[in-house]
Amino acid sequence: MARANFAFTNFTAGELSPRLNGRSDLAKYFNGCETLENFLIHPHGGATRRPGTRFVAEVKTSSLQTRLVPFQFNVTQAYVLEFGNNYFRIYKDGGQVTSGSPASAVEVTTTYATADLAALKFAQSADVMYVVHPDKPVRKIARTSHTAWTITDVDFARGPFLDPNTTATTLTSGARTGSVTITASAATGINGGSGFTTDDIGRLVKLHHGYAEITAVGSTTSITATVQDNDVFDTELEPSYTASTISFAEGDPSSTSLEHNDRIIDSAKNWVKQGFLDNMEITVSGAGTSANNTSYLIVKVTDDTLLLAPSDDVVNESASSSITVVGKLVADDEWALGAFSPETGYPSSVTFYEQRLTFAGTASQPQTVFFSVSGDFENFTAGTEDDSALIYTLGSNQVNVIRYLS
């Protein structure tokens, strides 16, 4: 009986599992092979031998594990990073990047020990590469020139945060800006009821609409934090009031004919037509010269009493055409703690998705994906706008950590 041999014309199916031996009923059976070693498969089906390698340089410590990571800015500027025990070195164009006289290898110190290398994951945008590890803060590698490289912690703006507080525990800030002391009424709701710990240092905290980074822990209910730029720990006004109907007059305070209901704005730039919460203060400020010598009364509302401040019948001059209302620093139960910390873990996966820097796979939220503000990779300000940061938790019958993002 004649023997028929099939002509294999392409190998786009790659190596086939031994479990597919004899499965000639599958289309891919005729596009694969049992073993394809040291070959490169072309998109159009053919295969050629892989290119050879050559010795460029010895790694820093040959006895320890080393990991090679590509860093490609474009098709003409491509590097290889040699990650080793607490360092990385750089290679380009078949050689090691060096500097100085005599020349020495450019080396950057890292916090990644040999045991950490296998768990590192990377996402690159132009000259910046983000590096994640489940037990370490997110860092970024930046290239500023051929021989100038840095690796620094990522300074996230306004998040991401855990779910908002739902307990009766309140936080009170001792000041509005700069370095502030924040005191909790109880440990309930903070790190599972254990309160603040030293693992919270470097963690973000959101108090109402202010944001700060924890710099020290005094006790389980007391921390020191630095308010982030352009943020203040002000209590936002609500459009309600407890005093009798209040009007705002602009012009000569002695002339009642000028009284009307002009609106004012609170510290969050929200318009408030009239009324306050308890114990709110009005602060007048201005710059330049007033064309009509406009005057404003500075008043304080306490429950149902309208008082002039600092004393009766005091009129303060101001060239400002707006009034800023700043709430008193009071205990507030509207707070949240940062999602990335030694206490909660750090993301183990990273990628870019639709102009957003995306993280996933923390120890406390293994199935949650964190998306940055669109086009602003290190900004995680949540909101309702189309470009606001997003936090999304996958729903499934098993809770398994997200291992990979693409």
List PLM regions with ranges.
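N-terminal beta-propeller domains
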Residues: 1-102, 140-179, 327-406
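Small/polar beta-strand repeat architecture
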Residues: 5-21, 97, 101-120, 156-176, ...
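Residue-level detector of short, conserved catalytic/binding motifs and their immediate flanks
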Residues: 66, 79, 86, 127-128, ...
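Elongated alpha-helical scaffolds
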Residues: 79, 83, 110-139, 357
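Short loop/turn segments that connect beta-strands within the blades of beta-propeller domains
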Residues: 84-86, 125, 132-135, 207-210, ...
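Hydrophobic residues embedded in beta-strands of well-ordered beta-sheets
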Residues: 88, 138, 148-149, 180-181, ...
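Short, glycine-/Ser/Thr-/acidic-enriched flexible segments
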Residues: 136, 219, 230, 364-365
